[in-house]
Amino acid sequence: MSEFNFISRLHNRGLISHITNEDNLSKLIENKSISLYCGFDPTEESLHIGHLLPLIMLKRFQIAGHRPIILIGGATSLIGDPSFKEKERVFNSNYNVNIWTEKITKQISCFLDFNCGKNSAVLLNNNTWFKQINILSFLRDVGKYFSVNTMINRAAVKQRITRPDQGISFTEFSYNLLQAYDFFILNQQYQVDLQIGGADQWGNISSGMHLIHRKTKRVVYGLTVPLLIQSNGIKFGKTESGTVWLDSNKTSPYKFYQFWMNIEDANVYYFLKLFTFIKVSEINKLEKNKNIKNQIINDKSLLAKHITQLVHGKEKLLAAERITKFLFLKNTTHIEESDLQQLKQDGIPFIEVSNVKDLQEALVLTSLAQSRTQAKNMIISNSISINTEKIRKNHIFHEKDKLFGKFTLLSRGKKQHSLLCW
């Protein structure tokens, strides 16, 4: 296989976890434009950064001349995928799923081009076909092609079946067949030859390939991207403060940007290959220089810039950079009111105040100090700043301390901050 073909380039970036019939798939996509799909169940009002790799993979295929199809699981989200889940999901209402579908559709739309000719992206909802099939038809036309023995032994559900305190309901157990039917319908109606997803979706993807082959004798393909786990064993995208969402109302662009700035050093160059479109040769050059002073920090910044702009756009990237300079480089020149609103949203701790008299009181209220005595000592020792300016004695707040008439930034040293909101 040529090292320059598309699949080889994906391997070179570390983007493939599983792939079926690799040689044939590689030949197929080198010789013609194919249709591929990835499904997203609206089980929350926003996608999170765990969804980024499949979305970016769809974008890579589209850039290479193929047609990406986004399948929103309006039907399957009412059931819930049990794959590698420790306990049964709580059922979502039709009302919530419909609202979440609208929000997630808007999020996904910014990743792909829906107006570029033959390989324009397509967005579908599997509720379209599931509302048209009855249970008897489904069992006869789909269920008969699956062995319960095989389904029970799939790794994705086996851990639940072997746990007497949990088990798995027939409802969740049937999810595998529903997703397989999605692949079958998309192959029949949209000529989809490839399904992609996270590594935890391998069992569901395999079932779809199995169903299509049994019913039509056609050969289709599956490909999964790596499931990223942090060194602490927690899934990538989870932090001490919760999930990192793609919706700017749930995770601000500043906090999103800072997430990437704070990844482990060992992952920087791997993530540049996974999440950006920078050439691998250029990333390798950066990695060779990683021991140069500040090089890794600069390369984290490069990663954060690329992904924040991809997800949130140029303007919100610039806002995240302004806030970063404001907090860490004491640059207040270009800070905007909306930037401080982002900080209040989830960037740093804040308190609402109206009649705080002096700095010592404010430091105690914000928990930057445990007592007025400690606050006094910190001020004397030159540890406290107001709006990035060092304060050397107790301070009575004035209107000039209120940025945009609303905000005052208190800092203890370089890393502890709190926002007074007047």
UniProtKB/Swiss-Prot annotation:
Cellular component terms (Gene Ontology): cytosol
Record PROSITE patterns: S4
Keywords, sorted A to Z: Aminoacyl-tRNA synthetase, ATP-binding, Cytoplasm, Ligase, Nucleotide-binding, Protein biosynthesis, RNA-binding
EC number of this enzyme: 6.1.1.1
Residues reported in the UniProt entry to bind ATP: 238
Reaction equation(s) it catalyzes: tRNA(Tyr) + L-tyrosine + ATP = L-tyrosyl-tRNA(Tyr) + AMP + diphosphate + H(+)
Classification via Gene3D superfamilies: HUPs, RNA-binding S4 domain, Tyrosyl-Transfer RNA Synthetase
Motif ('HIGH' region): 42-51
Binding site for L-tyrosine: 37, 175, 179
GO BP terms, alphabetized: tyrosyl-tRNA aminoacylation
UniProt-annotated location(s): Cytoplasm
Superkingdom of source: Bacteria
Gene Ontology MF, one: ATP binding
Top-level enzyme category: ligase
S4 RNA-binding domain segment(s): 357-414
UniProt cross-references to CDD domains, sorted A to Z: TyrRS_core (cd00805)
Residue ranges of the motif 'KMSKS' region: 235-239
Subunit-structure text: Homodimer.
Role of this protein: Catalyzes the attachment of tyrosine to tRNA(Tyr) in a two-step reaction: tyrosine is first activated by ATP to form Tyr-AMP and then transferred to the acceptor end of tRNA(Tyr).
Family that this chain belongs to: Belongs to the class-I aminoacyl-tRNA synthetase family. TyrS type 1 subfamily.
Protein name (database record): Tyrosine--tRNA ligase
